[in-house]
């Protein structure tokens, strides 16, 4: 009987047993020797039912599964196969001990009882039951994120130590498989977005901004991995030697990863990978000096610290438009044609190519009404140059686009509008005062008090923007980048992070998020657009009220801990004069 039971437990068939409703039971014709023995035998051979269910799942596993966590389900099949192999080995050892009357198992008696057999198989009974629970739960998951989350929930929700160990073993096996797949993801273009979003984040196509991440991933890690992949796919085409060297390093790093994975360990892995990519690929194409030039251009052109840029741009637009209007009748065609010419001539006249190198090729001048350009932002923020609402954009090419994301590009375009509107309004008031002298000389005298107040306010705001915020923060950024370069610890992720911190600080201190203040400033700009030097006295002027409201908006920042108190207080003191 014992031999028949062991054969049955190992997956063989036996005439002494029947299968009923998925359960294997002792045949009714077989009469047990003692009362209760049938129930005990049926309890022992229940392992055969469990083994059969697991084996069936392994055998019918669909290699063509379209589930996004397919590679994890394959890992589950391997884990189940491994456990069944160990189970079969233990049965073979058990039968050997019975046949040889091994005293370790048989003891002092001559025969092995069913109770001894049951006790010996108790651990496997628990293990096979746990494997079925594991298989049932995981096979229902459709994504990588949900699979790892399910494992986490099962681990945290169980009070049984052995089950926790099994779940942890499964999790480590899955994570090892995930790491292997990660390397393949980083170096191969599968062209399957659904795989990428599930692989990194969950059940959404917008995988870069997904909040349902794999438990050991953060959004920063996801962004870093996507950047690494972009670099590797580009290197695959033009840097074969570097690509192969980095790939070998990737496999070494993955092999050395401690399990189970944590956010900290995966962050370190992504950082080391990006460091390799930076050294071997990125800075071979985008040198430190070019990044340094880009930073200078961001400050001087995009943030308009170069006071000659906007006036020159306006002058060029006026001249080029005059040339084109003589040969073109359609205004839309004229604008499309002349803006690239205007920018090119402005760059040439100011010799910006000498100053910033090839970085000037990243600049693009567009009309605010260009609906095809996805980077156009809010219509509430406009800069009027010679009657046309223009916007200067940054169109960075790889690998320069690793220095800042699309959101940062949009911020620079908005800051160009914000600072440009400020600059043009100050120029407008100054021109009014300049022309006023001629009218005053002819005996025409008009009240200009509100314009003086407005000029004082806008000039104070401009001085604060450049002397207190932009110049110091970008000077510090360049010094930090230079220090990294000198210590030979330059990595693109560090450059990008330093720039992001600088831009975040500048945005905050330039009141980028204060819509109330911007509405008030836009009201000032709108009123100024109504003025003509000879008509100032006829305008129903509300400038003083708008200036007063703007100052009040700034005063409210005095005790706000999120602002740099020293410089914000200096501005408030100046505005209180």
UniProtKB/Swiss-Prot annotation:
GO biological process: one example: spindle assembly
A GO molecular-function annotation: gamma-tubulin binding
GO terms under cellular component: cytosol; equatorial microtubule organizing center; gamma-tubulin complex; gamma-tubulin ring complex; microtubule; mitotic spindle pole body; nucleus
Protein's cellular compartments: Cytoplasm, Cytoskeleton, Microtubule organizing center, Spindle pole body
Keywords in alphabetical order: Cell cycle, Cytoplasm, Cytoskeleton, Microtubule
Pfam families cross-referenced by the UniProt entry: GCP_C_terminal
Main localization, broad class: cytoplasm
Coiled-coil residue spans: none
Highest taxon, organism lineage: Eukaryota
Transferase among keywords: no
Reported function: Required for proper anchoring of astral microtubules at the spindle pole bodies (SPBs), during anaphase, ensuring correct cell polarity.
UniProt similarity note: Belongs to the TUBGCP family.
Protein name, as recorded: Gamma-tubulin complex component gfh1
Organism listed in the record: Schizosaccharomyces pombe (strain 972 / ATCC 24843)
Lineage: Eukaryota, Fungi, Dikarya, Ascomycota, Taphrinomycotina
């Amino acid at each position: 009987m014992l031999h028949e039971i062991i054969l049955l437990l190992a997956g063989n068939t036996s005439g002494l047993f029947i299968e009923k409703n998925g359960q294997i039971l002792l045949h009714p014709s077989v009469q047990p020797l003692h009362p209760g023995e049938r129930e005990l035998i049926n309890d022992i051979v229940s392992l055969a039912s469990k083994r059969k269910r697991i084996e069936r799942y392994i055998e019918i596993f669909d290699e063509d599964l379209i589930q996004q966590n397919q590679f994890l389900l394959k890992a589950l099949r391997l884990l189940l196969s491994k456990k069944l192999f160990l189970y079969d080995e233990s049965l073979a050892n058990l039968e050997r001990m019975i046949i040889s009357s091994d005293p370790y198992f048989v003891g002092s008696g001559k025969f092995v009882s069913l109770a001894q057999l049951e006790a010996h198989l108790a651990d496997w009974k628990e293990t096979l039951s746990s494997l079925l629970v594991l298989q049932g739960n995981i096979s229902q998951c459709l994504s990588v994120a949900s699979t790892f989350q399910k494992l986490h929930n099962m681990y945290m929700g169980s009070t049984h130590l052995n089950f926790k160990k099994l779940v942890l073993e499964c999790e480590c096996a899955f994570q090892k498989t995930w790491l292997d797949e990660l390397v393949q993801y980083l170096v191969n273009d599968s062209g399957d977005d659904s795989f990428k979003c599930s692989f990194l984040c969950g059940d959404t196509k917008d995988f870069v901004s997904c909040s349902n991440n794999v438990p050991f991933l953060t959004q920063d890690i996801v962004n870093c991995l996507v950047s690494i992949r972009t670099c590797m796919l580009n290197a695959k085409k033009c840097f074969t030697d570097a690509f192969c060297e980095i790939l070998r390093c990737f496999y070494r790093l993955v092999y050395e990863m401690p399990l189970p994975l944590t956010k900290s360990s995966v962050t370190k892995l992504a950082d080391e990978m990006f460091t390799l990519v930076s050294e071997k690929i990125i800075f071979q194409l985008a040198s430190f000096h070019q990044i340094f030039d880009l930073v200078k251009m961001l400050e001087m052109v995009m943030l308009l610290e170069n006071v000659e840029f906007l006036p020159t741009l306006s002058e060029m637009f006026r001249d080029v438009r005059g040339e084109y209007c003589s040969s073109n009748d359609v205004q839309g065609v004229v604008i499309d044609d002349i803006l690239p010419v205007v920018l090119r001539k402005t760059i040439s006249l100011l010799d910006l190519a000498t100053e910033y190198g090839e970085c000037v090729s990243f600049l693009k001048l567009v009309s605010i009404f260009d609906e095809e350009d996805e980077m156009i932002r809010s219509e509430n923020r406009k800069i009027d140059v010679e009657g046309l609402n223009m916007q200067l954009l940054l169109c960075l090419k790889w690998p320069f686009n690793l220095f800042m994301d699309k959101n940062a590009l949009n911020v620079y375009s908005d800051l160009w509008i914000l600072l440009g509107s400020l600059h043009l309004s100050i120029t407008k008031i100054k021109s009014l005062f300049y022309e006023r002298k001629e009218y005053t000389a002819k005996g025409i005298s008009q009240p200009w008090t509100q314009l003086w107040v407005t000029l004082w306010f806008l000039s104070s705001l401009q001085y604060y923007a450049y002397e207190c915020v932009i110049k110091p923060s970008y000077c510090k950024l360049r010094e930090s980048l230079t220090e990294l370069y000198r210590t030979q610890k330059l990595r693109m992720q560090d450059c990008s992070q330093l720039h992001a911190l600088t831009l975040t600080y500048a945005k905050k201190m330039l009141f980028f998020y204060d819509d109330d203040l911007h509405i008030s400033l836009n009201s000032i700009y709108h009123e100024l657009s109504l003025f003509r030097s000879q008509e100032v006295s006829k305008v129903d002027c509300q400038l003083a009220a708008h200036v007063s409201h703007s100052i009040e908006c700034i005063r409210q920042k005095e005790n706000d801990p999120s602002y740099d108190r020293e410089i914000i207080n200096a501005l408030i003191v100046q505005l209180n004069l």
